[in-house]
Amino acid sequence: MKCSLLLVVFAAMVALFAAGTNAAMNQRKMLEVIGGLKKEK
């Protein structure tokens, strides 16, 4: 029981970390796209 609980907590932490890094990458891509649009104008 205790082992499975630790696995669930670990999996949740990994999922949160993956979501955080993914969001940061998406934000950087959006900033690059916005910067590119401003340069074109």
Swiss-Prot record:
Official protein name in the record: U-megalopygitoxin(4)-Mo5
Organism name: Megalopyge opercularis (Southern flannel moth)
Gene Ontology MF terms: toxin activity
Keywords linked to the UniProt accession: Secreted, Signal, Toxin
Cleaved signal peptide residues: 1-23
Iron-sulfur keyword on record: no
Major location (coarse): secreted
Family, similarity comment: Belongs to the caterpillar 4 family.
